Amino acid sequence: MSLFNRAEIIDNNFTSFVKSGNLPQARIDLPLSHTNIKPSDLVSLFESQVLSRHMDLKARLMKDDGKCYYTIGSSGHEGNAVFGKIFPYTDMAFLHYRSGALFIERSRQTPGTTPLYDLALSFTASADDPISGGRHKVFGSKKLNIPPQTSTVSSHVPKAVGVALSIERARDLDIQERELKNDSVVLCSFGDASINHSTALGGFNTAGWVTHQGGHVPIVFICEDNGIGISVPTPENWIRDSFVNRPGYKYIACDGLNLIDLIEKSKEAELHCRNHRSPVFIHMKTIRLMGHAGSDIESGYHKQETIEKTEFNDPLLHSCRILIQNRCLSADDILNLYESARQTVNHVCESAAKRPKLKTAENVMESITAHTFNRTVPTIPGQKDREAIFGKKSARLGQPQHMAKLLNYGLSDIMLRYPNTLVFGEDVAQKGGVYHVTADLHSQFGMRRVF
């Protein structure tokens, strides 16, 4: 067994440590008897964790055979399965790329989903991949309210904030075509290194700024802090100190290796966000296993002792300790579940590997050109409706104008035709923008749509 093949070592260690009872000690003392958590819920969560782990292990084996093209896994982050259970699938989720367990657990909420097969199609770049058509490995599902995201550099954070902001705005404007309920919240997960990106900082600031002024931004930010961004360590306490006293936020720290603590803290976060309609920041301390991806040789920047110490803190081993201590499962039960999950994943992945790939230009373009359902657009406003909006400017619509004025007219037409369109930003409301591109929109369409 090669010291560089950490996936194989972690796999073998799991079986060995469970058999011998050599399991890591709890980082916090939180007895199951002091909670209302059902043992069956712990078992379900553990199964999702194990399935996610085996998807990672299988992906690396298939890569060696030329059948898999993506090996950034979720190993070490399997505690996020809890978020897939506590938050209903009706809450939209913008997910980090290590969300395998969350995706699998969330799928249990709706019948007819096939999370393992969908992930396998994505791993193998199959044209049948239901969310990206084999173009990119992302977590996504329309049925589960998970818009697909390339989340590596937190580009999804501003989008998540925008959705959270839109929930009550859509209600107040009586927009009928809505995906989310009035009491929905939005989930947005990311890694610890991602919070330093300007896109993320803009999203965090917007959520806090709106909340500070009395607005509602019902969003749960989930920072899955494994302490390292690819090879660069995150400074100690940087995440906590950046958010623990951030205006407008409720900060909740939890142990990402402890299912019991995760469940209790997730319930607290869900209740606070849903009731107060304001941002919550969950700081989930966890670990990363098997490096950043299959191509990452972790021994190039971590000592062997450090790697092995981290591997012994495997969240699956922590879950085993909890299950055995609380007599939810025996060691034999756990090992049987682990091997059964391996067989399931092997079968699903081998089946997915046989599905069609993107072989022609037509295959590549199909997701753009395919007409899968009839689309309808709002009726073009009539002349009287336009005159009511433009007023005295109606007479100038056919005359030559400079670009800023033409953009202004275009925005008025768009907002008249599409009642779900908003314009918001610095100086765009009453002032109408520094160059008057948004002039008069505030008076034409009101402060709920232009702000």
Predicted regions and their residues:
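Conserved acidic/glycine
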Residues: 1-80, 86-87, 290-445
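Cofactor-binding active-site loop characterized by glycine-rich and histidine/acidic residues
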Residues: 54-57, 61-219, 229-249
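Short glycine-rich or small-residue beta-strand-to-loop segments that form or flank ligand, phosphate
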Residues: 69-70, 187-191, 253, 421-427, ...
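Flexible loop/turn segments at secondary-structure boundaries
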Residues: 79, 100-104, 195-197, 227-231, ...
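Short glycine-enriched loops at secondary-structure junctions
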Residues: 126, 225-227, 235-237, 286-288, ...
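Conserved thiamine diphosphate
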Residues: 171, 178-182, 235-268, 311-340
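Long, amphipathic alpha-helical stalk/connector segments used for oligomerization, subunit docking
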Residues: 271-276
